[in-house]
UniProtKB/Swiss-Prot annotation:
Mg(2+) 2 binds at D10, D134. Endonuclease that specifically degrades the RNA of RNA-DNA hybrids. Mg(2+) 1 binds at D10, E48, D70. It comes from Haemophilus influenzae (strain PittGG). GO terms for biological process: DNA replication, removal of RNA primer. Its EC number is 3.1.26.4. This is Ribonuclease H. Residues 1-142 form the RNase H type-1 domain. The keyword Magnesium applies. It comes from the Bacteria. Its main location: cytoplasm.
Length: 154
């Protein structure tokens, strides 16, 4: 029987681009694990994606996951847009390369062994776990220690 996990994620950026951070809360039964990391130069969308990737990569076995995020970009990308991107050799409908392709590929790889129910939550609306993730992401952004490998300045 696969473990049922709840994951809440958020990304933050001080300036866009600027220093960024990720926050995640993983819950299994009564156990909670919190993640917070900061990156020197990045974008908000990259942090939203990286928060999910980092959270999923902490899991040691395939799980049944309900994943909550306030990022429509991440949710629509992984549940709708990615299928055409992959078919079109990572080109957007405009014909231009998909932005943040490195992280979309990493996210696509990290979801393969799990069954995920994707849920959008309204940000800054009093959702307890989303508020915690927001704080964790801001903390990370305020104390960056990592390079966001793959970030390309526009």
């Amino acid at each position: 029987m696969q473990k049922q996990i709840e994951i809440f994620t958020d990304g933050s950026c001080l300036g866009n681009p600027g220093a960024g951070g990720i926050g995640a809360v993983l819950r299994y039964k009564q156990h909670e694990k919190m993640l917070s990391k900061g990156y020197f130069k990045t974008t908000n969308n990259r942090m939203e994606l990286r928060a999910v990737i980092e959270a999923l990569n902490t899991l040691k076995e395939p799980c049944l996951i309900t994943l909550y995020s306030d990022s429509q970009y991440m949710k629509n990308g992984i549940t709708k847009w990615i299928f055409n991107w992959k078919k079109n050799n990572w080109k957007a409908s405009s014909g231009k390369p998909v932005k943040n392709q490195d992280l979309w590929i990493a996210l696509d790889e990290s979801i393969q062994r799990h069954k995920i129910n994707w849920q959008w939550v309204k940000g800054h609306a009093g959702h307890r776990e989303n508020e915690i993730c927001d704080e964790l992401a801001k903390k990370g952004a305020e104390n960056p220690t990592l390079e966001d490998m793959g970030y390309i300045e526009e």
